[in-house]
UniProtKB/Swiss-Prot annotation:
Record's function text: May be involved in transcriptional regulation.
Alphabetized UniProt keyword annotations: Nucleus, Transcription, Transcription regulation
Compositionally biased spans, kind Basic and acidic residues: 1-27
Cellular compartments annotated: Nucleus
Region (Disordered): 1-44
Chief subcellular location: nucleus
Taxonomic superkingdom: Eukaryota
Species whose genome carries this gene: Homo sapiens (Human)
A Pfam family of this chain: BEX
UniProt keyword annotation of Transferase present: no
Taxonomic placement: Eukaryota, Metazoa, Chordata, Craniata, Vertebrata
Name of the protein described by the UniProt record: Transcription elongation factor A protein-like 9
Family: Belongs to the TFS-II family. TFA subfamily.
A cellular component term, taken from the record's GO annotations: nucleus
């Protein structure tokens, strides 16, 4: 009967400390700390992004470009595109004309 009483009562191993106890709040594993830091960073990034968007919406009405300024900006963008396309074509030609392309 003693064996039945032991089974009905507390387990024998309860007097021993558990090795797989959850860590105290002070002693969090490094992985949890990293996750919390990432969550905070994402939260702050999101807040900064929202703030930036609001500032842009407020500021957009104060930005008036004259026709000359608009043409100048468009010309700069076109020049950047032309140079970029030239570089892409030059790189393509160099890679295509290689005698042994698989040795690179």
């Amino acid at each position: 009967m003693k064996s039945c009483q032991k089974m009905e009562g507390k387990p024998e191993n309860e007097s021993e400390p558990k090795h797989e106890e959850e860590p105290k709040p002070e002693e969090k594993p490094e992985e949890e700390e990293k996750l919390e830091e990432e969550a905070k960073a994402k939260g702050t990034f999101r807040e900064r992004l929202i703030q930036s968007l609001q500032e842009f919406k407020e500021d957009i009405h104060n930005r008036h470009l004259s026709n000359e300024d608009m043409f100048r900006e468009v010309d700069e963008i076109d020049e950047i595109r032309r140079v970029r396309n030239k570089l892409i074509v030059m790189r393509w030609k160099v890679n295509r004309n290689h005698p042994y392309p698989y040795l690179m």
